[in-house]
Amino acid sequence: MTLFASSWKWILASGALLLALGAGAPAFAQPAISGMQSQTGPRLDFPAGLAVDGRAVYVSSSRNNAITAIDLTSKSLTVVAGTIFQQGSNDGIGDAARFNSPDGMTIVGQDLYICDTNNSDIRKLNIPSRTVTTIAGTANIAGTEDGHGTAAHFNLPTQIATDGQALYVADSGNSAIRRITLADMNVKTIAGQAGTTGKTEGNMTKSMFNGPRGIAVDKKAIYVADTGNEVIRRIDISTMETSTIAGTGEEGDKDGPAKEAQFNNPGAICTDGTALYILDADNHSVRKMDLTANTVTKLTLVNGHIGSGCALSSDGKQLYFSDTTENSVEVVDTSSGNVTTLYPPGG
């Protein structure tokens, strides 16, 4: 499967979007916005990126070009930033901000970092103030350049993860992994050869990817769903060496020893440090890789079109993901594999 910038519109149409992991701050009490209402209030339209803290699940409602929050107690949905159906790239407060198909998200403190995919840049949303600023990349200018802040360029970034000191971005259109140091917003390509596809392992000058659309990080490694290559890759943080840890490189649906397992359009991934959870989109399943035993199993099957995004609760007991057929957010018990609907309530 070839997955590169030219196929991005197909990705959006099929529902293969990414979601991201985070932890942070409370949800909001904000009126529903006209144009996003159903009979019972606001709704999601093609939910993409997810981030979760102890009080809310944040959802990038991609077709609405808005960032929303689901209160974990009341299950109510509110709009945090963006104006429904109004795409753009403006920074600003709340509904004065504009996005263009926002996707993956992660939280550091009270700041939500967002892959604003079709603007090819990275945005920061301060949750208490609802203030949106562009921290890296330049809207509507795709490129491969490293540099500080808006001097750098991305090409359809999809998912983002953090270790608290840096942001790690799956720069899908460039088939590269980028790091943004939070202290100075310096952007550096740490794996992959930006603008070139391949499947090579090795250090940052040799490794190659093909449209990576999932990324997660723990204390020792960065994990990447190398979607176009149908494999899961691991980047050692200390050496920046890339290796393949799961998948044969052929489309399939096979559990077992990690390097014998097969995937079909793996998207978002997240980790608690002991297991890696993989949204295997075209197999309609959530897969679990035991990072000690190096085995892959199915955690659960999904009836609808599984969104390519996930987020773990802080205790690792619940895995959140989106369903782009039902425009819903689902919850999987990571022990039993049982699935319930978080939003819409009663879904």
Located regions from the model:
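Bacterial N-terminal signal peptides that target proteins for export
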Residues: 2-14
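Gly/Pro-rich loop segments of beta-rich domains
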Residues: 30-48, 74-101, 131-156, 186-211, ...
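Hydrophobic core register within WD40 beta-propeller blades
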Residues: 50, 105, 160, 215, ...
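A short loop-to-beta-strand structural motif that recurs across blades of beta-propeller domains
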Residues: 65-69, 120-124, 131, 175-179, ...
